[in-house]
Structures are given as structure tokens and as C-alpha cells.
């Protein structure tokens, strides 16, 4: 029986963004079930106008003899005309789009036209509460929604049940699924580092404790709070030990979307050894960085999932996180003696409410910090919580990890890896299986739209 063909709309899977990386992982993990065509997005794509058939290379990498993957590079995420062309040329069985729904308003404008022939699928993440009821029309435009975080699953279930408008239909069970990001355990894993790797970053300097931050230098990632938290931690150490700890940052030092980290360090971090990685790294190199670190930190005020800390735990390195968005899914939170599930979040909403949930039982591999919530907004996104932490509270958690032995930290990280591969469900295999199950359900249950739909007013 011929495989179904999926048209994927997302970042070019050859690129380095988080969306591109996840796209690549689930495409490679499901090429035995589906043929893939990607409208491969990038800003001012250098390959615009070309078509790339990656099938032979994918066959070598995966061992799937009939793997079929084709890319159409494009400037941005697309438009109505190119979708119509690809529907005619490639004749896919479904369209799957991935990232913030605000990028896809043009797609939702033609959803009725598309859904006369193929289902429209959405791999979805939403950063925070309150429930974004302004997304209701977007959800109505999709036949199936795969939710990347448990919080997103709860949000989507609740918003989808809002029936204010007569044309809105309540989602059927198959239409909303939990499809967590999965980390490739064959790439991110505990290893013995090559002798020269540490020297390539630190020279001959040896550190007793390395805190690692791997994020874009943008405002919501809170890089300055990380710097100030580390400085506060260092000031609490005896003077003779201050030179033996460092903050390793894998990011741009100056970014218009973030800040000038060099000036911040010069003015406010006189006691800190802050070192920036010297280059971009392959996935293997990123795994080296996680293994080099003692702890990885992410205290972003909005975070859909947080790939860096998830990769860190899979590599066996423990973490510090802000209890926000998808970062919660990496903690192994428990209530009433069981791990929280996606269905639990329909009622809970989010654990970011400090008054209700601070101190919730969690895995040994993480030290979570509960935020204070404020509400931000814009015209397209009228309201969303902004979950901020106090950098002084973060410094306390850094000290807690520091006071443990390296062996204790490593043991905690390895427990996290085992949990992710098991009950945590954050393995690559689970992402691909849940993605396939969702797609199969959509293909099986899809009912093409009629050309016209009659509404009685």
C-alpha cells in the first residue's frame, strides 16, 4: 500500500532553529510511514527557486529504503498561491503546519478551500495562560492539533470547547492530541569528552563548576537575569573559590532583539567568569557542551518548550528552570503519588501559580523556581502572562547544585534521562509515535468540506 504524502510548512529542516531541528527529527522518524514534502521557510532564503530531493541521503541516514523527502525553499512561511501550486503539483494527502498561529493567518483565510480536498493539521505550542480565546478561530480552521506541551494541550481543549459563535464546533476526541517534543537519545547522551574540547573553550583553565546557558539573546530569555543571578552566587562564595566557577553562554554577545551582554558584564558582574562559546556547533558539539556543564539553566519568562534544558537532561546533566510553559514538562511533577499527565492540565491550567503550586514534588534532576506573573499584550495577542523570577532566588538554586558533589549532580541528571526515556515520554520515539497516531486519526476521520456551507441567521 502506497504511503501517504504530507506537505510540511515550517522552518527549513536543514537550518539550525528549534523548529527546524524538531521538524527534521519527526520527518526522519516517520519516513517509513509517510512521504514528506516541505515548503522550507527561511528569511531571504538563499535557495529560493530551487527544489531539493533529499531522498537518497535520508535513505542512507535512516535505512528506510523507500524514504522520500523533498524540499521547496521559500522566503517566509508561504502564501496562498504557493500552497495552491503545491497542492496541484505534489497532491499531498494532508498539510501539517508548525509554529505560532500568527504566522498562518493567510493559511486560515483559505482553510475552507484547502479542506475541500485535504485535512489541515497543526503542530501547536502556546507559551502561557490566560486561555487565548483569540485563537478560537484558528483552532476551528484545523482538522487536527498536536500539542507540544501539556499546558498547550489543556489550553487547546478548553479554548476549543468555547462555543460563543454558531459556526464553532466542539472538537472530537481525535482532533486534539498530546505530541511532546522528543529528544534524540542517540545524539544527546552521557559521554567522555574529547581531551581537546574543554581546551577549545577554556584553554588550560580548569573549573570546579560550570553553569551553562544555551539560548538566543532575546528579551524573554532573560539573559541579564542569568548574569545577575550568577554574580550573586559568586559573591556568596569564599574569595579563593570564586575563580573556579564560570558561566558558559552559548549565544550572541550583542543582539538588537536582546541586549549588550558585554557591557552588562563589565558594569555589573565584576566577580564572575563569563565565557562565550567561540563558534556554532553541530548536534554532536552541543552534546559535548551539555556534558561539559555541571548544570544547565533556563529562566525564560515565556517558553513554549525549552529544547536546551530537555537536551541537557537527556545528556545526563541536571537543570534549573522557571516553572512556565513547556519547561514544566521536563520536571517530573507529581500530585497524589502520580506523574501529571496532559489530561491533568485541562483542570490545572499551569503550575506557574506560585500561591497554589510552589513546592509541588518534582524529579531530582531539576531545581524549579516559581515565578511572579504579570500580564503583557499586543494587538494580535491581547493578553498573555509574563512569568518573571527574582534573580536573587535563582542564585540560591545555583548554590544548591554547587554544594553537591559532581557525582551527586551526575547521578541526578542520569535519573532525569531515565525518566525522559520512560514515563516522561520525551523521547524521539514517543514524539514520532504520537505524531503518527494523530496524523492517522486525522486521515481516517477527515470529512472534506462542501464547497459552500449554509448558516441560518
Feature roles, as predicted:
Residues 8, 203-221, 227-230, 247:
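Conserved donor-binding/catalytic core segment of Leloir-type glycosyltransferases
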Residues 70, 258-280, 284:
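Nucleotide-activated donor-binding/catalytic signature segment of Leloir-type glycosyltransferases, i.e.
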Residues 8, 53-151:
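Extended catalytic core of nucleotide-activated donor transferases of GT-like folds
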Residues 1-56, 90, 456:
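N-terminal subdomain of nucleotide-sugar transferases
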Residues 352-457:
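C-terminal amphipathic helix plus adjacent low-complexity
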Residues 301:
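Aromatic "clamp/platform" in nucleotide-sugar-dependent glycosyltransferases that forms part
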Residues 318-321, 338-341:
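Short hydrophobic beta-strand element within catalytic cores of glycosyltransferases
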Residues 132-176, 183-190:
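A short, active-site helix/loop in glycosyltransferases that binds the activated sugar's phosphate group
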